[in-house]
Amino acid sequence: MEPEIKIVNVVVSTQIGTDIDLEYAADILDNAEYEPEQFPGLVCRLSEPKVALLIFRSGKLNCTGAKCKEDAVIAIHKIIKELKEAGMDLIDNPEVNVQNMVATTELGMEPNLDDISTLECTEYEPEQFPGLVYRLSDPKVVVLIFGSGKVVITGLKVIEDAYKAYDKISKTLKELEEELY
């Protein structure tokens, strides 16, 4: 049965221009904060789509919190439009690259994390963090497995890798169970 995998965060980056006047941009944009003594970038939070955008003087822009790449692109275009209308010289349609996606799913069972921690590429220190960290090399992602059966997959570039990772973990857990019991 195909697992229900839900994307919960997409982080993208792009270049919207060069030498951005962040003080001016902060004055123009609603919900923008610019405190250079705290953080070198301007932080702008949108409610629709619900994302946070980080804009740097270099023109680099990161968008986080989107549920899909399309939402991030919409948010970036909204910001570019607002800044251009205020006279800023920016790139109209910048190339947007996915840096990371985070997905969640369920195993459908409560795994024995102590047993799984015997596998290579796993870390489990319940005193420090309740989840088991499982680093896969293909696809190159990090899978967090919790005792409740909840799974978080991070480091994704494409959704297909979430399914590959889930299949690989499921297969490995079945093999481990057969070996141990």
Curated annotation (Swiss-Prot):
Protein name per Swiss-Prot or TrEMBL: TATA-box-binding protein
Pfam families: TBP (PF00352)
Function: General factor that plays a role in the activation of archaeal genes transcribed by RNA polymerase. Binds specifically to the TATA box promoter element which lies close to the position of transcription initiation.
Keyword terms of this UniProt record: DNA-binding, Repeat, Transcription, Transcription regulation
NCBIfam families from the UniProt entry: PRK00394.1-2 (NF001593), PRK00394.1-3 (NF001594)
Family indicated by similarity: Belongs to the TBP family.
Sequence repeats: 7-83, 98-173
GO MF entry, a single one: DNA-binding transcription factor activity
Listed GO biological process terms: DNA-templated transcription initiation
